[in-house]
Amino acid sequence: MVNTKSGLLLTLTLFGHANIVRYIPRPFQTVDEMNEELIKRWNKRVGKKDMVYHLGDFCFKSRYEDSRNSKWTFQDYLEQLNGTVILFEGNHDPPNVDGYPLWRDAVIQTKIGAVYCSHHPGIGVPMDIKKLFHGHAHLHGPVINIDRWNKTFVDVGVDHHDYYPISIDEISILIKQFKKYHKAKRDDTVLQV
């Protein structure tokens, strides 16, 4: 387990989304296999007392029937997962998730500074914030971008991180490696990894 004192960031699990296996593509044969593996990897990385910021697209539908005819609800997925989960609204999340609150966006204080968190990259970001975490992995874009205003965008989607949650410490290392590698290649557009 990694050091998770600053919380974990994760998105786009899309539990119950059969077609996401093909769209991304994900390395699973069935949606049941995907759901089970995502839960297993989450619980391997996240402790019972950890905080997880899930930046949208938690599940595809509020109800999912698996191959064993078990009906999974939004709450059923949450009950299988370690940690306290703060859910952000994504474009695939059902509008009413059994009264569970969904955040639109937030600025959180972390050991690497203030970070803007949202499902959608770069929308409504306060100008003084330089680090942005988003969970929109189905943009099929890079994991890290730095724009011409020197804002750092990090996609925390599971598809980019071997289907595990990613910690603040791991994100910090990624950003440092990215900046060091691309320091000489910088132009006024966007850097990508």
Region locations from a protein language model:
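Hydrophobic/aromatic beta-strand patches that form the interior of the parallel beta-sheet core
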Residues: L8-L10, Y53, I86, A137-L139, ...
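Acidic, histidine-bearing metal-coordination/catalytic regions of metal-dependent phosphoesterases
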Residues: M1-Q29, D162-V193
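Core catalytic region of metal-dependent phosphoesterases/phosphodiesterases
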Residues: V2, L10, F15-Q109
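Conserved beta-sheet core of the metallophosphoesterase superfamily
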Residues: V97-L191
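Generic serine detector
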Residues: S6, S62, S67-S70, S118, ...
